[in-house]
Protein backbone atom coordinates (compact mmCIF):
# COMPACT_ATOMS: atom_id res chain seq x y z
CA UNK A 1 0.00 0.00 0.00
CA UNK A 2 2.75 2.38 -0.80
CA UNK A 3 3.32 4.41 -3.86
CA UNK A 4 6.01 6.15 -5.79
CA UNK A 5 7.52 9.54 -5.55
CA UNK A 6 6.77 12.55 -7.68
CA UNK A 7 4.10 14.77 -6.21
CA UNK A 8 2.48 17.47 -8.23
CA UNK A 9 0.10 20.23 -7.31
CA UNK A 10 -3.28 18.63 -7.92
CA UNK A 11 -6.53 20.44 -8.54
CA UNK A 12 -7.99 21.22 -5.17
CA UNK A 13 -11.36 21.33 -3.46
CA UNK A 14 -13.36 24.15 -4.93
CA UNK A 15 -14.82 25.98 -1.94
CA UNK A 16 -18.40 25.20 -1.11
CA UNK A 17 -18.73 22.47 -3.71
CA UNK A 18 -18.77 19.46 -1.39
CA UNK A 19 -21.16 17.03 -3.07
CA UNK A 20 -24.20 15.78 -1.24
CA UNK A 21 -23.79 12.08 -0.62
CA UNK A 22 -27.49 11.59 -1.17
CA UNK A 23 -26.86 12.15 -4.87
CA UNK A 24 -23.95 9.74 -4.86
CA UNK A 25 -24.82 8.07 -8.19
CA UNK A 26 -22.82 10.44 -10.39
CA UNK A 27 -19.56 8.82 -11.48
CA UNK A 28 -17.84 12.18 -11.97
CA UNK A 29 -17.68 14.09 -8.71
CA UNK A 30 -18.66 17.75 -8.75
CA UNK A 31 -15.55 18.67 -6.76
CA UNK A 32 -12.93 20.43 -8.82
CA UNK A 33 -10.29 18.37 -7.10
CA UNK A 34 -11.97 15.03 -7.59
CA UNK A 35 -10.05 14.16 -10.71
CA UNK A 36 -6.88 14.16 -8.70
CA UNK A 37 -6.33 10.43 -8.40
CA UNK A 38 -2.63 9.75 -8.24
CA UNK A 39 -0.07 7.80 -6.36
CA UNK A 40 -0.31 8.37 -2.64
CA UNK A 41 2.69 9.95 -1.07
CA UNK A 42 2.86 7.78 2.02
CA UNK A 43 5.17 9.14 4.67
CA UNK A 44 7.20 8.28 7.68
CA UNK A 45 7.42 9.33 11.30
CA UNK A 46 7.82 8.67 14.97
CA UNK A 47 11.01 8.97 16.97
CA UNK A 48 13.83 10.87 18.55
CA UNK A 49 15.30 13.07 15.87
CA UNK A 50 13.78 16.43 15.09
CA UNK A 51 14.52 18.37 18.23
CA UNK A 52 17.95 16.87 18.70
CA UNK A 53 16.91 15.35 22.05
CA UNK A 54 17.62 11.62 22.04
CA UNK A 55 16.44 8.70 24.13
CA UNK A 56 12.93 7.84 25.25
CA UNK A 57 12.04 11.38 26.27
CA UNK A 58 13.27 12.87 23.00
CA UNK A 59 11.39 10.22 21.08
CA UNK A 60 8.11 11.16 22.69
CA UNK A 61 8.71 14.88 22.89
CA UNK A 62 9.17 14.96 19.17
CA UNK A 63 6.37 12.64 18.24
CA UNK A 64 3.78 14.08 20.62
CA UNK A 65 3.93 17.76 19.78
CA UNK A 66 1.16 18.10 17.22
CA UNK A 67 -1.46 16.04 19.03
CA UNK A 68 -2.15 17.57 22.39
CA UNK A 69 -5.37 15.61 22.85
CA UNK A 70 -3.59 12.51 24.11
CA UNK A 71 -4.49 12.45 27.76
CA UNK A 72 -6.27 9.11 27.57
CA UNK A 73 -4.66 5.87 26.50
CA UNK A 74 -7.81 3.76 26.55
CA UNK A 75 -9.88 5.12 23.68
CA UNK A 76 -13.65 5.16 23.97
CA UNK A 77 -15.43 3.05 21.32
CA UNK A 78 -15.63 5.10 18.12
CA UNK A 79 -18.96 6.57 17.11
CA UNK A 80 -21.07 5.04 14.34
CA UNK A 81 -20.39 6.50 10.93
CA UNK A 82 -23.19 7.67 8.66
CA UNK A 83 -23.32 9.78 5.51
CA UNK A 84 -23.91 12.92 7.53
CA UNK A 85 -20.70 12.42 9.47
CA UNK A 86 -18.73 11.78 6.27
CA UNK A 87 -20.12 14.96 4.69
CA UNK A 88 -19.26 16.95 7.80
CA UNK A 89 -15.72 15.60 7.63
CA UNK A 90 -15.45 16.62 3.98
CA UNK A 91 -16.45 20.16 4.87
CA UNK A 92 -13.65 20.26 7.44
CA UNK A 93 -11.16 18.85 4.90
CA UNK A 94 -12.30 21.51 2.44
CA UNK A 95 -11.62 24.17 5.06
CA UNK A 96 -8.11 22.83 5.72
CA UNK A 97 -7.32 22.87 2.00
CA UNK A 98 -8.50 26.47 1.69
CA UNK A 99 -6.35 27.50 4.68
CA UNK A 100 -3.32 25.77 3.13
CA UNK A 101 -3.97 27.39 -0.26
CA UNK A 102 -3.42 30.85 1.21
CA UNK A 103 -0.57 32.26 -0.93
CA UNK A 104 1.11 33.57 2.25
CA UNK A 105 1.52 30.01 3.50
CA UNK A 106 3.39 29.14 0.28
CA UNK A 107 3.56 25.38 0.87
CA UNK A 108 6.32 23.52 -0.98
CA UNK A 109 5.00 20.97 -3.44
CA UNK A 110 6.93 17.99 -2.08
CA UNK A 111 5.86 14.98 -0.03
CA UNK A 112 3.97 15.03 2.27
CA UNK A 113 1.93 17.63 0.35
CA UNK A 114 -1.35 18.30 2.13
CA UNK A 115 -2.88 19.88 -1.00
CA UNK A 116 -2.55 16.49 -2.69
CA UNK A 117 -3.20 14.30 0.35
CA UNK A 118 -6.61 15.63 1.35
CA UNK A 119 -8.05 15.59 -2.20
CA UNK A 120 -6.69 12.04 -2.61
CA UNK A 121 -8.25 11.02 0.72
CA UNK A 122 -11.57 12.54 -0.35
CA UNK A 123 -11.33 10.67 -3.65
CA UNK A 124 -10.62 7.32 -1.98
CA UNK A 125 -13.46 7.83 0.50
CA UNK A 126 -15.79 8.51 -2.44
CA UNK A 127 -14.70 5.22 -3.98
CA UNK A 128 -15.35 3.42 -0.68
CA UNK A 129 -18.81 4.99 -0.36
CA UNK A 130 -19.75 4.13 -3.93
CA UNK A 131 -18.75 0.49 -3.28
CA UNK A 132 -21.00 0.42 -0.22
CA UNK A 133 -23.96 2.17 -1.77
CA UNK A 134 -27.10 0.74 -0.19
CA UNK A 135 -24.90 -1.07 2.39
CA UNK A 136 -23.95 2.00 4.38
CA UNK A 137 -24.88 0.22 7.61
CA UNK A 138 -22.24 -2.47 7.02
CA UNK A 139 -19.66 0.22 6.42
CA UNK A 140 -20.84 2.33 9.36
CA UNK A 141 -20.39 -0.64 11.70
CA UNK A 142 -16.92 -1.54 10.44
CA UNK A 143 -14.61 -0.90 13.40
CA UNK A 144 -11.62 0.13 11.30
CA UNK A 145 -13.69 2.58 9.26
CA UNK A 146 -15.23 4.10 12.39
CA UNK A 147 -11.83 4.62 14.01
CA UNK A 148 -10.46 6.04 10.76
CA UNK A 149 -13.29 8.54 10.26
CA UNK A 150 -13.21 9.70 13.86
CA UNK A 151 -9.46 10.28 13.58
CA UNK A 152 -9.82 12.12 10.27
CA UNK A 153 -12.36 14.40 11.90
CA UNK A 154 -10.03 15.03 14.88
CA UNK A 155 -6.96 15.69 12.76
CA UNK A 156 -8.77 18.12 10.43
CA UNK A 157 -10.15 20.03 13.44
CA UNK A 158 -6.67 20.10 14.94
CA UNK A 159 -5.22 21.51 11.73
CA UNK A 160 -7.90 24.22 11.63
CA UNK A 161 -7.16 25.20 15.24
CA UNK A 162 -3.42 25.21 14.45
CA UNK A 163 -4.08 27.93 11.84
CA UNK A 164 -6.34 29.77 14.27
CA UNK A 165 -3.75 29.77 17.06
CA UNK A 166 -0.66 30.14 14.84
CA UNK A 167 -2.01 33.22 13.00
CA UNK A 168 0.83 34.98 11.07
CA UNK A 169 3.39 32.45 12.29
CA UNK A 170 1.84 30.01 9.81
CA UNK A 171 3.50 32.11 7.09
CA UNK A 172 7.01 31.59 8.53
CA UNK A 173 8.54 28.45 7.10
CA UNK A 174 10.65 27.66 10.17
CA UNK A 175 8.14 28.44 12.93
CA UNK A 176 6.87 25.82 15.40
CA UNK A 177 3.27 26.03 14.08
CA UNK A 178 4.61 25.29 10.58
CA UNK A 179 6.61 22.34 11.93
CA UNK A 180 3.36 21.06 13.45
CA UNK A 181 1.61 21.48 10.10
CA UNK A 182 4.33 19.32 8.53
CA UNK A 183 3.79 16.67 11.20
CA UNK A 184 0.05 16.72 10.62
CA UNK A 185 0.70 16.41 6.88
CA UNK A 186 2.78 13.31 7.60
CA UNK A 187 -0.04 11.90 9.71
CA UNK A 188 -2.54 12.58 6.88
CA UNK A 189 -0.24 10.77 4.47
CA UNK A 190 0.05 7.76 6.80
CA UNK A 191 -3.74 7.75 7.11
CA UNK A 192 -4.23 7.77 3.35
CA UNK A 193 -1.68 4.98 2.80
CA UNK A 194 -3.40 2.94 5.52
CA UNK A 195 -6.89 3.55 4.11
CA UNK A 196 -5.68 2.38 0.68
CA UNK A 197 -4.04 -0.65 2.29
CA UNK A 198 -7.17 -1.69 4.19
CA UNK A 199 -9.72 -0.66 1.52
CA UNK A 200 -7.87 -1.33 -1.74
CA UNK A 201 -10.12 -0.30 -4.65
CA UNK A 202 -12.71 0.79 -2.08
CA UNK A 203 -13.58 -2.63 -0.60
CA UNK A 204 -12.70 -3.69 2.94
CA UNK A 205 -9.93 -6.29 3.00
CA UNK A 206 -8.51 -5.66 6.45
CA UNK A 207 -9.33 -9.18 7.64
CA UNK A 208 -7.15 -10.71 4.90
CA UNK A 209 -4.34 -8.12 4.98
CA UNK A 210 -0.99 -9.87 4.42
CA UNK A 211 1.71 -9.01 6.95
CA UNK A 212 5.07 -9.15 5.14
CA UNK A 213 7.20 -10.85 7.80
CA UNK A 214 6.03 -14.42 8.53
CA UNK A 215 6.82 -14.48 12.27
CA UNK A 216 5.17 -11.07 12.76
CA UNK A 217 2.11 -12.34 10.87
CA UNK A 218 1.95 -15.39 13.13
CA UNK A 219 2.09 -13.19 16.25
CA UNK A 220 -0.81 -11.01 15.02
CA UNK A 221 -2.91 -14.02 14.02
CA UNK A 222 -2.40 -15.73 17.39
CA UNK A 223 -3.03 -12.55 19.39
CA UNK A 224 -5.81 -10.88 17.38
CA UNK A 225 -7.15 -13.37 14.82
CA UNK A 226 -8.57 -11.55 11.83
CA UNK A 227 -8.86 -8.18 13.57
CA UNK A 228 -7.75 -5.19 11.52
CA UNK A 229 -7.28 -2.77 14.39
CA UNK A 230 -6.83 -3.07 18.16
CA UNK A 231 -6.61 -0.49 20.96
CA UNK A 232 -3.02 0.37 21.85
CA UNK A 233 -3.46 -1.10 25.33
CA UNK A 234 -4.42 -4.54 24.00
CA UNK A 235 -1.56 -4.44 21.52
CA UNK A 236 0.94 -3.46 24.20
CA UNK A 237 -0.16 -6.31 26.48
CA UNK A 238 0.06 -8.91 23.70
CA UNK A 239 3.46 -7.68 22.52
CA UNK A 240 4.80 -7.60 26.08
CA UNK A 241 4.24 -11.37 26.39
CA UNK A 242 6.59 -12.01 23.48
CA UNK A 243 8.90 -8.98 23.59
CA UNK A 244 8.98 -7.64 27.17
CA UNK A 245 8.56 -3.86 27.39
CA UNK A 246 10.73 -2.59 30.22
CA UNK A 247 8.75 0.43 31.49
CA UNK A 248 5.76 2.69 31.00
CA UNK A 249 8.12 5.24 29.48
CA UNK A 250 9.40 2.71 26.96
CA UNK A 251 5.81 1.73 26.16
CA UNK A 252 4.88 5.34 25.40
CA UNK A 253 7.97 5.84 23.25
CA UNK A 254 7.14 2.64 21.38
CA UNK A 255 3.62 3.88 20.81
CA UNK A 256 4.93 7.13 19.38
CA UNK A 257 6.93 5.15 16.80
CA UNK A 258 4.35 2.55 15.79
CA UNK A 259 1.10 4.57 15.96
CA UNK A 260 1.68 6.32 12.62
CA UNK A 261 -1.85 7.71 12.47
CA UNK A 262 -1.76 8.92 16.12
CA UNK A 263 -5.18 7.59 17.10
CA UNK A 264 -4.40 5.32 20.11
CA UNK A 265 -5.06 2.21 18.01
CA UNK A 266 -2.64 -0.08 16.20
CA UNK A 267 -3.79 -1.36 12.82
CA UNK A 268 -2.50 -4.43 11.03
CA UNK A 269 -1.11 -1.96 8.47
CA UNK A 270 0.90 -0.01 11.09
CA UNK A 271 2.13 -3.27 12.60
CA UNK A 272 3.33 -4.43 9.17
CA UNK A 273 5.23 -1.16 8.62
CA UNK A 274 6.84 -1.29 12.07
CA UNK A 275 7.93 -4.94 11.79
CA UNK A 276 9.45 -4.28 8.36
CA UNK A 277 11.33 -1.22 9.62
CA UNK A 278 12.72 -2.89 12.74
CA UNK A 279 13.22 -6.45 11.46
CA UNK A 280 14.17 -9.13 12.33
CA UNK A 281 11.22 -10.03 14.54
CA UNK A 282 13.31 -12.14 16.94
CA UNK A 283 15.06 -9.01 18.24
CA UNK A 284 12.35 -6.45 17.38
CA UNK A 285 12.57 -4.23 20.47
CA UNK A 286 16.34 -4.50 20.69
CA UNK A 287 16.53 -3.29 17.06
CA UNK A 288 14.09 -0.48 17.79
CA UNK A 289 16.06 0.62 20.88
CA UNK A 290 19.35 0.65 18.96
CA UNK A 291 18.00 2.31 15.81
CA UNK A 292 15.41 4.73 17.14
CA UNK A 293 15.64 5.35 20.87
CA UNK A 294 19.39 5.71 21.33
CA UNK A 295 20.68 6.42 17.82
CA UNK A 296 21.58 10.10 17.21
CA UNK A 297 21.02 9.65 13.46
CA UNK A 298 17.35 8.70 13.76
CA UNK A 299 14.90 11.47 12.85
CA UNK A 300 11.26 11.40 13.82
CA UNK A 301 8.55 12.90 11.65
CA UNK A 302 11.09 14.44 9.27
CA UNK A 303 10.52 15.00 5.56
CA UNK A 304 12.89 14.88 2.58
CA UNK A 305 13.22 18.69 2.56
CA UNK A 306 13.86 18.85 6.31
CA UNK A 307 16.60 16.22 6.05
CA UNK A 308 18.34 18.30 3.38
CA UNK A 309 18.06 21.42 5.54
CA UNK A 310 19.39 19.62 8.61
CA UNK A 311 22.41 18.14 6.80
CA UNK A 312 23.26 21.54 5.31
CA UNK A 313 25.00 22.39 8.62
CA UNK A 314 27.42 19.50 8.03
CA UNK A 315 28.11 20.18 4.37
CA UNK A 316 31.87 20.44 5.15
CA UNK A 317 31.84 17.17 7.08
CA UNK A 318 31.44 14.36 4.50
CA UNK A 319 30.08 11.16 6.02
CA UNK A 320 27.53 13.04 8.17
CA UNK A 321 24.20 11.21 7.93
CA UNK A 322 20.70 10.92 9.36
CA UNK A 323 17.86 8.51 8.60
CA UNK A 324 14.06 8.64 8.63
CA UNK A 325 11.07 6.60 7.53
CA UNK A 326 10.71 6.98 3.79
CA UNK A 327 8.01 9.49 2.84
CA UNK A 328 7.09 7.81 -0.41
CA UNK A 329 7.61 4.17 0.53
CA UNK A 330 6.20 3.31 3.92
CA UNK A 331 8.02 0.40 5.52
CA UNK A 332 11.37 1.45 4.08
CA UNK A 333 14.11 3.72 5.37
CA UNK A 334 15.64 6.75 3.70
CA UNK A 335 19.23 7.62 4.65
CA UNK A 336 20.46 11.14 3.94
CA UNK A 337 24.21 11.75 3.86
CA UNK A 338 26.85 14.29 2.85
CA UNK A 339 29.15 13.12 0.05
CA UNK A 340 32.89 13.82 -0.31
CA UNK A 341 32.17 16.51 -2.92
CA UNK A 342 29.72 18.33 -0.64
CA UNK A 343 26.40 17.07 -2.02
CA UNK A 344 23.48 15.81 0.05
CA UNK A 345 22.03 12.53 -1.20
CA UNK A 346 19.15 10.43 0.11
CA UNK A 347 19.02 6.73 -0.56
CA UNK A 348 16.62 3.88 0.26
CA UNK A 349 18.45 0.66 1.21
CA UNK A 350 16.93 -2.46 -0.37
CA UNK A 351 16.83 -6.10 0.72
CA UNK A 352 18.64 -5.68 4.02
CA UNK A 353 17.69 -4.52 7.53
CA UNK A 354 18.62 -0.93 8.34
CA UNK A 355 21.35 -1.89 10.83
CA UNK A 356 23.09 -3.90 8.09
CA UNK A 357 22.88 -0.95 5.68
CA UNK A 358 24.36 1.35 8.35
CA UNK A 359 27.17 -1.10 9.18
CA UNK A 360 28.02 -1.54 5.47
CA UNK A 361 27.83 2.22 4.86
CA UNK A 362 30.17 2.85 7.80
CA UNK A 363 32.71 0.34 6.47
CA UNK A 364 32.52 1.95 3.03
CA UNK A 365 33.03 5.43 4.51
CA UNK A 366 29.59 6.88 3.64
CA UNK A 367 27.81 6.89 7.05
CA UNK A 368 30.38 8.00 9.61
CA UNK A 369 28.92 10.86 11.67
CA UNK A 370 25.31 10.48 12.85
CA UNK A 371 23.72 13.95 12.83
CA UNK A 372 27.27 15.33 12.49
CA UNK A 373 28.55 13.71 15.73
CA UNK A 374 31.97 12.09 15.87
CA UNK A 375 30.84 9.01 17.79
CA UNK A 376 29.08 6.45 15.56
CA UNK A 377 27.09 3.75 17.46
CA UNK A 378 28.38 0.21 16.98
CA UNK A 379 25.47 -1.82 15.63
CA UNK A 380 27.38 -5.07 15.02
CA UNK A 381 25.74 -6.57 18.13
CA UNK A 382 22.42 -6.59 16.27
CA UNK A 383 23.83 -9.20 13.88
CA UNK A 384 23.94 -11.74 16.73
CA UNK A 385 20.84 -13.71 17.66
CA UNK A 386 18.94 -12.38 20.68
CA UNK A 387 18.88 -14.34 23.91
CA UNK A 388 15.24 -15.41 23.63
CA UNK A 389 12.72 -14.70 26.37
CA UNK A 390 10.14 -17.43 26.56
Swiss-Prot record:
GO-annotated cellular components: membrane raft; plasma membrane
Residue ranges of coiled coil: none
Molecular functions per Gene Ontology: calcium ion binding; phosphotyrosine residue binding; receptor tyrosine kinase binding; SH3 domain binding; ubiquitin protein ligase activity
Family matches, as PROSITE patterns: CBL_PTB
Amino acid composition bias (Gly residues), ranges on this chain: 42-52
InterPro entries named among the record's database cross-references: Adaptor_Cbl, Adaptor_Cbl_EF_hand-like, Adaptor_Cbl_N_dom_sf, Adaptor_Cbl_N_hlx, Adaptor_Cbl_SH2-like, Cbl_PTB, EF-hand-dom_pair, SH2_dom_sf
A GO BP entry: cell surface receptor signaling pathway
Region annotation 4H: where it falls in the sequence: 77-205
Ranges that cross the membrane: none
Binding-site residues, 4-O-phospho-L-tyrosine: 324
Region annotated SH2-like, chain positions: 279-381
Residues the entry annotates as binding Ca(2+): 259, 261, 263, 265, 270
Region named Disordered: 1-52
Residues annotated as domain Cbl-PTB: 77-381
Keyword set includes Repressor: no
Keywords carried by this UniProt record: Calcium, Metal-binding, Oncogene, Repeat
Task performed by this protein: Induces early B-lineage lymphomas.
Note: This protein is synthesized as a Gag-Cbl polyprotein.
PANTHER family registered for this protein in UniProt: CBL (PTHR23007), E3 UBIQUITIN-PROTEIN LIGASE CBL (PTHR23007:SF5)
Entry's free-text remark on domains: Is composed of the phosphotyrosine binding (PTB) domain, a short linker region and the RING-type zinc finger. The PTB domain, which is also called TKB (tyrosine kinase binding) domain, is composed of three different subdomains: a four-helix bundle (4H), a calcium-binding EF hand and a divergent SH2 domain.
Protein name: Transforming protein cbl
Organism expressing this protein natively: Cas-NS-1 murine leukemia virus
Amino acid sequence: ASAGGGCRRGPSFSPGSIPSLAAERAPDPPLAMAGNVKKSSGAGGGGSGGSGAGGLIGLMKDAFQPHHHHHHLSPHPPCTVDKKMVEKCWKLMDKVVRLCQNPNVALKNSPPYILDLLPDTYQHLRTVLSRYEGKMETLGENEYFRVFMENLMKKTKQTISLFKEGKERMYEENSQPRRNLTKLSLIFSHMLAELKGIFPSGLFQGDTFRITKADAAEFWRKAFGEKTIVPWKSFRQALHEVHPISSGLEAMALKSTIDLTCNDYISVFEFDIFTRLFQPWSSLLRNWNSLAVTHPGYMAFLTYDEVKARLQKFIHKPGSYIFRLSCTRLGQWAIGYVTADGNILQTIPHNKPLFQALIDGFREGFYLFPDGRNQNPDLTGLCEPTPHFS
